[in-house]
Curated annotation (Swiss-Prot):
<dbReference type="GO" id="GO:0005829">
    <property type="term" value="C:cytosol"/>
</dbReference>
<feature type="active site" description="Schiff-base intermediate with substrate">
    <location>
        <position position="162"/>
    </location>
</feature>
<dbReference type="GO" id="GO:0008840">
    <property type="term" value="F:4-hydroxy-tetrahydrodipicolinate synthase activity"/>
</dbReference>
<dbReference type="InterPro" id="IPR002220">
    <property type="entry name" value="DapA-like"/>
</dbReference>
<dbReference type="InterPro" id="IPR005263">
    <property type="entry name" value="DapA"/>
</dbReference>
<comment type="pathway">
    <text>Amino-acid biosynthesis; L-lysine biosynthesis via DAP pathway; (S)-tetrahydrodipicolinate from L-aspartate: step 3/4.</text>
</comment>
<dbReference type="GO" id="GO:0009089">
    <property type="term" value="P:lysine biosynthetic process via diaminopimelate"/>
</dbReference>
<keyword id="KW-0456">Lyase</keyword>
<feature type="binding site">
    <location>
        <position position="44"/>
    </location>
    <ligand>
        <name>pyruvate</name>
    </ligand>
</feature>
<keyword id="KW-0028">Amino-acid biosynthesis</keyword>
<dbReference type="InterPro" id="IPR020625">
    <property type="entry name" value="Schiff_base-form_aldolases_AS"/>
</dbReference>
<comment type="similarity">
    <text>Belongs to the DapA family.</text>
</comment>
<comment type="subunit">
    <text>Homotetramer; dimer of dimers.</text>
</comment>
<protein>
    <recommendedName>
        <fullName>4-hydroxy-tetrahydrodipicolinate synthase</fullName>
        <ecNumber>4.3.3.7</ecNumber>
    </recommendedName>
</protein>
<feature type="site" description="Part of a proton relay during catalysis">
    <location>
        <position position="43"/>
    </location>
</feature>
<keyword id="KW-0220">Diaminopimelate biosynthesis</keyword>
<keyword id="KW-0704">Schiff base</keyword>
Length: 293
């Protein structure tokens, strides 16, 4: 199983292609600063605009770089086509990913029964652990707690959910109603509250910039030192907020470019760089922090 501190990796581009040299460097930085896992080709990795070949190559590279370290790979394998999700899941398993992150199918807005059948099909196609991913603001559909409970009972390898609905009532309800399904934060602004409610980790956007701080915040909480965790969470508050001033991953890539972690600032359309106003705000907030190489 994959728990603890994880970063939802960005995908760097150069001249409209994936910059794998920089990608490897960024993953090695995650290893250096004590993260427990990296998460390639999720929302932050612009998976929606990667080709199948690029998607698979990103997983392969992440697995290769992390091999031999303590850092695991939670590979993005989500799709709004169940057959495509199964294909990505099987590929990730074959190349050595430790677990899968599967977002709810987007755009086609399945019913709860459709979600159940989708996830069951993906989970039954593989042997490695599967983490559900609930982000209704992106997908237009939310996994109901009863559906998550049914999936946990029906599929032994569905072990956790990344919760990014932003509703603390759901977080508390998950702990009470589905205690055998691990809960992880999918939103940096509520990392601490979720960890304080028996969360088992975080999947962080901010961790791309501040892996050591996110690792420390998470590890302190998991060790029961909530005061230390809270202190770090408070220090990161302004950064967590500004990194969502526009659609993720637009601000995080801009911040990484300004911090010298990216060679250039490039997105795949329809994503574009931040507005001049937001770029200035990101720069202003970034100057308050020290970004380690």
């Amino acid at each position: 199983m994959v728990f603890g501190a994880m970063s939802a990796l960005i995908t760097p581009f150069i001249n409209h292609k994936v910059d794998f040299e920089t990608y490897e460097t960024l993953i090695k930085r995650q290893i250096t600063y004590g993260m427990d896992a990296c998460v390639p080709v999720g929302t932050t990795g612009e998976s929606a605009t990667l080709s199948h070949k690029e998607h698979m190559e990103c997983i392969e590279v992440a697995v290769a770089v992390c091999r031999g370290s303590k850092v695991k790979v939670l590979a993005g394998a989500g799709s709004n086509s169940t057959s495509e999700a199964k294909e990505l899941a099987l590929f990730a398993q074959k190349c050595g990913a430790d677990a899968l992150l599967c977002v709810t199918p987007y755009y086609n807005k399945p019913t709860q029964e459709g979600l159940f059948e989708h996830y069951k099909a993906v989970a039954n196609a593989v042997e490695i652990p599967v983490m559900l991913y609930n982000v209704p603001s992106r997908t237009g559909v939310s996994i109901e707690i009863e559906t998550a409970k049914r999936l946990r009972d029906a599929c032994k390898n569905i072990y956790a959910i990344k919760e990014a609905a932003g509703l603390m009532e759901r977080v508390v309800a998950f702990g009470a109603e589905v205690p055998n399904l691990a809960l992880l934060s999918g939103e940096d602004v509520i990392n601490y509250p979720i960890l304080a409610n028996n969360g088992k980790g975080v999947i962080s956007v901010t961790g791309n910039l501040f892996p050591q701080e996110i690792a420390d915040l998470t590890h302190y909480a998991l060790q029961g030192n909530m005061e230390k965790s809270y202190e770090i969470n408070t220090r990161l508050y302004e950064m967590n907020r500004i990194l969502f001033c526009e659609s993720n991953p637009v601000p995080i890539k801009a911040a990484m470019f300004l911090a010298g972690l990216l060679k250039n600032l490039e997105y795949r359309l329809p994503l574009v760089p931040p507005s001049k106003e937001n770029m200035a705000k990101i720069q202003q907030i970034l100057e308050k922090y020290e970004v380690k190489e």
